[in-house]
Swiss-Prot record:
The gene is OR4M2B. Odorant receptor. Residues 47-57, 119-142, 226-238, 292-313 are extracellular. This is Olfactory receptor 4M2. The lineage of its organism: Eukaryota, Metazoa, Chordata, Craniata, Vertebrata. It comes from Homo sapiens. PROSITE patterns: G_PROTEIN_RECEP_F1_2 (PS50262). It is found in: Membrane.
Length: 313
């Protein structure tokens, strides 16, 4: 990388999702309604699993972690995006940009690793039911979750370390509503091919390898469950759980691979895919799991009745 003198950029200007006031107002109402509707649902999932003594299996512990990561992941960009709808000049400082990049990749990669852990948990529950409690004990479950977070942290450190060493001398406009790493790399005043290649390999490797492993494991599980299709309600519930997992995997990994596992060129769909990737899909993930889980739904109804409706009376 060249070391010539340059004027360091201290802030970036975000173009946002739209420059039209009327469109901005409509988008604000839509995203705020969506965020305020789904966010409490994820919080309720965490509270339900934490407070209900019957939801002690590793599956529920992992689900609570997923809900937390999804809340965190979406909240990194959503509040600022909503505020910027009413700001004429949308500015983010260089330090805030780096912090946003770090936490976004930290939470996103951690969630991908966690989904892989959840697939292992489901595999153990279906294929080794008699040994499930022994294999997926509390200690192993905590270790796997900790490794997921550690993997996300290492991935995020790599991304940020590559960004901070780049020179930024102008322009400083990012064609996005948040500090997107693909946009930041594009405006650096240097040849970014080596950094971009490492970023694509890092993000793409995590996304593609995890996706292939997950799809192969679910294909194996569904094939196994198809042979046991006459075994009753438990088999049907396992199939339903598998489809829930597959739905989450597709929603999570599809946009991520589209954005980060290719050269950082600009395409017309980038902003739309980014909105789904950072806001809509993450907040839906735990909800999709919960809708197919009778135990969690029953516990949620019990919690709402006990702590909310009773207090109103």
């Amino acid at each position: 990388m060249e070391t010539a003198n340059y004027t360091k950029v201290t802030e970036f200007v975000l173009t946002g999702l739209s420059q039209t006031p009327e469109v901005q107002l409509v988008l604000f109402v839509i995203f705020l309604s969506f965020y305020l509707f789904i966010l409490p649902g994820n919080i309720l999932i965490i509270c339900t699993i934490s407070l209900d003594p019957h939801l002690t299996s590793p599956m529920y512990f992992l689900l609570a972690n997923l809900a937390f990561l999804d809340i965190w992941y979406s909240s990194i960009t959503a509040p600022e995006m909503l505020i910027d709808f009413f700001v004429e000049r949308k500015i983010i400082s260089f330090d805030e940009c780096i912090a946003q990049l770090f936490f976004l990749h930290f939470a996103g990669a951690s969630e991908m690793f966690l989904l892989t852990v959840m697939a292992f948990d489901l595999y153990t529950a279906i294929c080794r039911p008699l040994h499930y409690a022994t294999i997926m004990n509390q200690r192993l479950c905590c270790i796997l979750v900790a490794l997921s977070w550690r993997g996300g942290f290492i991935h995020s450190i790599i991304q940020v370390a590559l960004i901070v060493r780049l020179p930024f001398c102008g322009p400083n406009e990012l064609d996005s509503y948040f500090c997107d790493i693909t946009q930041v790399v594009r405006i650096a005043c240097a040849n970014t091919f080596p950094e971009e290649l490492v970023m694509i390999c890092s993000s793409g490797l995590i996304s593609v390898v995890c996706l292939i492993a997950l799809l192969m494991s679910y294909a194996f599980l569904l094939a196994l469950l198809k042979k046991l299709s006459g075994s009753g309600e438990n088999t049907n519930r396992a199939v339903s759980t598998c489809y829930s997992h597959i739905t989450i995997v597709v929603l999570m990994f599809g946009p991520s691979i589209y954005i980060y596992a290719r050269p950082f060129d600009s395409f017309s769909l980038d902003k739309v895919v980014s909105v789904f990737n950072t806001l809509i899909f993450p907040l839906h993930n735990p909800i999709i799991y919960t809708l197919r889980n009778k135990e969690v739904k029953a516990a949620m109804r019990k919690l709402v009745t006990k702590y909310i409706l009773c207090k109103e009376k």
